[in-house]
């Protein structure tokens, strides 16, 4: 999910502007028509270099909803409309993503607002809440007061982080 979204900006944008918005609106399903409208809006806004034909839009719309189904955000199967499934970020993913952003050189405060958290429906406050909850597992110590956040990191590199997450 994370690496697909990082390598496929269209999938990332679909998640943050369509999927999570639908969840926020209390919708029960997302269909290929929602994905098609998303793509047409992107084309109209000039976000793509070349205008796509209708068959390409249909195929990519199906790809977007299919990816969401593959990652457990939407129900599986070959459907034009799919139910939204309960989805939340898992504790190991929170730890991995926090350390990944840290090792990229992103500061503690900036990390909370990084766009990758939006892939899991989290804004800055939601991210801070999740990090505080997970800090009880001992992967890091987090302190916050107002807008200031300080994290004491326990692991020296991503390999050490992955070993700790895996329990080795």
Feature annotation, model-predicted:
Residues 1-28, 90-106:
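Positively charged, polyanion-binding regions of nucleic-acid-associated proteins
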Residues 49-84:
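A contiguous pocket-lining binding segment that forms or flanks enzyme active sites
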Residues 155-168:
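Low-complexity, glycine/alanine/valine/leucine- and proline-rich hydrophobic stretches
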Residues 69, 75-158:
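Accessory, usually C-terminal, subdomains that scaffold auxiliary metal cofactors
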Residues 18, 42-46, 71:
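A short secondary-structure junction motif
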Residues 18, 64, 130-133:
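Residues in the recognition helix of alpha-helical DNA-binding motifs
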Residues 30-47:
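DNA-recognition alpha helix
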Residues 8, 12, 28-32, 54-61, ...:
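Alpha-helix N-cap/helix-initiation sites
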